[in-house]
């Protein structure tokens, strides 16, 4: 028979053969195989002829396979098959009924899962622990209550099962029970034992209190709380996985590392997210845990989280953390810009501020000039409250004394003394502009006392200008063409302090002397 390497070497040649050639080649190889087999059989018979007999003929028996299993495996396998006789033999031979497999599961756990009441009775009679716990702290009562096996629950309670046993998820048997009759049995038993809600909460807090006491003992001994334990996990990993808020708070106060990783690259936040501990997730993130931390297989806490509530909380915290980091980045960038230009930036801002203020004043002066240069409206506008007040003030004006002509202000400024402000009632208005800053201004400019006006005051001055026209040159006397309306009288000289005197209305003559128009104000 050809060797394996020889067959591999001839494969390219066989691939180039035709169908008939391949068939002949296969027959040749088959003949070689039969020949070699016949030769091997001949050699075997020749050895038997020389006195070498097979061991079967010498012993007269078939060989027995000796495969041995540990007692724990054998007991659990027999209990899973519900083999009462075999289990009885194991127990009689001295095998402990509390033997467990690698997951901490005992034969009694298996009976409560499979609903083998007689097997459970036999194990309990042999001394099985009714409160045995597996690797996740489940007792046989947890298993029976979860599966809804009422008769097994009653049996375990009668044998002293702990009704307040808490598993690694913080659940008691009645928390896991969904069958109504089984749940009623558990609640009745708890009521008979006098268990209250306070007792339930205390029982839930027992594991955390035990770990808290252990931590305090370690602190007194000066131990490092960040040292890794089994599988590289730290105490903060354990607290995060079990939801121990007080323990985690103490560890964080003592400086426990939030970035410590176990052998799988998991940080404490990974453990809290995987086991659905939403309070621990918030606590760790509040102390600066990295929501983007990755394990050895590039898994973030969000990737390993299977609980929808915890997942939503992680997403919310991630959005808040990203927004906070962006805000801090902007503040740092702004601080760097301010620091780099601290030598000259203040002066530039002040120069720009003064220029802007000057331009604003100039714009206001230009707007005021446009208002003064507009022609009076053709139709009389209805007087507002401020116009009525202007009319009342005009009635208080004294007639001008006879004498040589004096310089008149333009646009019908009333003839009050220069130091007298006609709008004393409006001095509380805000000052909007300043026309003439010089102390000695020309007669046609506003004096300093009248330099501050608002647009409403200018409107009143224009209303007053309609009622009073400039007289022709010469002594200030009434012309023959001027007439006084009926029902009015000449006002007294001086300002009257009581009441409002009647308004003197004058009718202009048909021909007026031309008066040279001057600009109303000076633009600075």
UniProtKB/Swiss-Prot annotation:
GO terms for molecular function: protein phosphatase regulator activity. The modification Phosphoserine is found at residue 432. InterPro entries: Ankyrin_rpt, Ankyrin_rpt-contain_sf, Pase-1_reg_su_16AB, PP1_Regulatory_Subunit. It is found in: Cell membrane. One of its GO terms (cellular component) is plasma membrane. It is a lipid-anchor. A lipid is attached at residue 520 (S-palmitoyl cysteine). ANK repeats lie at residues 70-99, 103-132, 136-165, 231-260, 264-293. Keywords: ANK repeat, Cell membrane, Coiled coil, Lipoprotein, Membrane, Methylation, Palmitate, Phosphoprotein, Prenylation, Repeat. The modification Cysteine methyl ester is found at residue 521. A lipid is attached at residue 521 (S-farnesyl cysteine). Highly expressed in testis, followed by liver, heart, brain and lung. Residues 368-421, 462-524 are annotated as: Disordered. It holds the Pfam family Ank_2. Residues 448-469 form a coiled coil. Residues 522-524 form a propeptide. Residues 514-524 have a biased composition (Basic and acidic residues). Inhibits protein phosphatase 1 activity toward phosphorylase, myosin light chain and myosin substrates. Binds PP1. This is Protein phosphatase 1 regulatory subunit 16A. It comes from Mus musculus.
